[in-house]
Amino acid sequence: MRKHFVLFSFPFLLLSSMLIFYQTTVFRNQLNEENDYTGGPIVPFMKRSLALHYQTCESFLNSLNTTVPVLLIDVDVLKMLDENACNLPTGRPTKIGVDVKYLSATWLLQDSRFEIVYYTNDTEKDFLDFRSEPRKIIPKKFSTCWVENLAVPADIKLFVEFWKRAKFVNCMNLHIPRAGSKVRMPARPSSEVLSRLRDELIENRMFPFLNGGTLLGWYRECSVIPHTLDMDISVFAEDFNLNFVEQMEQNLSDFRIKRKFGMTNDSFELTLAPKTGFKVFIDVFLMYKGVENGSVTHHWVGGVAPDGTKYKYSYPVYDPFCAADLHGHIFWVTCTPNEKIVKEYGQLWYLDHLTSKYSWNSSGKNVKKNGKWTKEQMKMVYKVFKR
């Protein structure tokens, strides 16, 4: 087996006597107080940005007021707000999200201003579940600012990224016979730790997706492979933020680095462990574009052996723009999981293979050698930390 929004308090924006104010509603409490990310360097920018937008978009936002709390989810309108262009969209209603607790407010369905999408906000899950077609789920941890009863995502660019990855993909939920195999990776605590890492990566503007054995376990059995020794996620190399590594090195993260292999432009891999909670090792791979004749023909992640040999795991062009539910936690996944899993594990992916009999650098169907680091290079690209 180879080896997450920012909550902050907006001051009253006294831009006019009727401008934005906070509502003490259950809706706001659920979306903001319980579920938002804490802290982060983008807060000052967001405050300035929102103040600017509300100064120029007050009348537009007020025109969307309703009698019950609603969430603005219309990506086109949000992008318009983010660009500080506040003309009403013509020819179509504005898409808003409404909690199913307000199903009795049937007059909303007759309001020509809106396209209604109902959602559920299950306290046992860390995502909002939209009853759209196709079904969409997004992390519930994002901050909002209120204009009357209209909740507007505070960080519009981040919300748009969530929505872009919102299409729900289901798992197969196959029964996998396992006689006497030891449970090394309890599913729920390990998934919870992985969700904490997801949140830290999101805070650093990275959008991780399941990969390797963790993708296989989710897709095949809607869970975590119980005998696996680690968890696998990937981040596109072009999205990687070195600030995250610096935060861990400065003890500003809930995770510590156990191993660091490769370079950010070649076969980069981090093995992380949580400082608290269930002890699980999580491998974070950078995923690179495979370019041939000027076109992206595949994606790949790397591996490094102790002797310096590099390995390359190739996949069809990756499309991690769908969302999955893993024990109540949202994780992003490829929209074509069967294709990626067959490429890595072969046509018999639905059969269990003990981790003890699986070689990380030879068992995969998509792995091949990819050169070798020199002894001098290995001093820089192969680091194991004992702390």
From Swiss-Prot:
It comes from the Eukaryota. It is a single-pass membrane protein. GO terms for biological process: protein glycosylation. The chain crosses the membrane at residues 5-25. Keywords: Membrane, Transmembrane, Transmembrane helix. GO terms for cellular component: membrane. It is found in: Membrane. InterPro entries: FKTN-rel (IPR009644). Its main location: membrane. Pfam families: W02B3_4_N. Belongs to the LicD transferase family. This is Uncharacterized protein W02B3.4. It comes from Caenorhabditis elegans.
